[in-house]
Amino acid sequence: MCRTLAAFPTSCLERAKEFKTRLGIFLHKSELGSDTGSVGKFEWGSKHSKEGKNFSEDVLGWKESFDLLLSSKNGVAAFHAFLKTEFSEENLEFWLACEEFKKLRSATKLGSRAHRIFEEFICSEAPKEVNIDHETRELTRTNLQAATAVCFDAAQWKVRALMEKDSYPRFLKSPAYRDLATQATAASASPSSSSPAEPLHT
């Protein structure tokens, strides 16, 4: 939901334009992106490759469930671009940090990484403090005394639930995603087309 200009340095309209720009840059930098130099263009349905079709299916899958969005590298990148316009990218960054943390096998690395994540996202006045309740924060602090791969599970679940309930629906309703989904739908319907999609309007 848009807040007052006193709360944010940019208006809702400017934030929407910023998301489109970020998403366009994301597409352009993607390995699947157009090499024309135009931001927001994409080779959706090249007859010489299945990559365009696969990407369009990926895009359409993002609205099926939050799990599918988070399991897609492109989806995470697009969602992160959107969250930056809402000044809430720390939620996704924390979730991703927890996912990487769980992959660690060294007890020494677990301990040091756990403290870095706590200092960056969990403790009061953290530079990227996420919105969790006091009880969850203190539980996580206690877990750090003997850090394991699951010591952030409670906090990660709370943040994920917040994103799924709050940010994810707004992402799906955003003009930029709807434009992208429209292009993806058209590409899926015409897989043999080699014409680039229309650029996102900014």
Swiss-Prot record:
Q: Which residues form a coiled coil?
A: none
Biological processes annotated in GO: G protein-coupled receptor signaling pathway; negative regulation of signal transduction; positive regulation of GTPase activity
Q: In its UniProt entry, what is this protein called?
A: Regulator of G-protein signaling 16
RGS domain ranges (all copies): 65-181
Q: Which SMART domains does the entry link to?
A: RGS
> Which locations, inside or outside the cell, does it occupy?
Membrane
Note down the stretches annotated as region Disordered.
183-202
Q: What is its main location?
A: membrane
Q: Which organism is it from?
A: Bos taurus (Bovine)
The gene designation is: RGS16
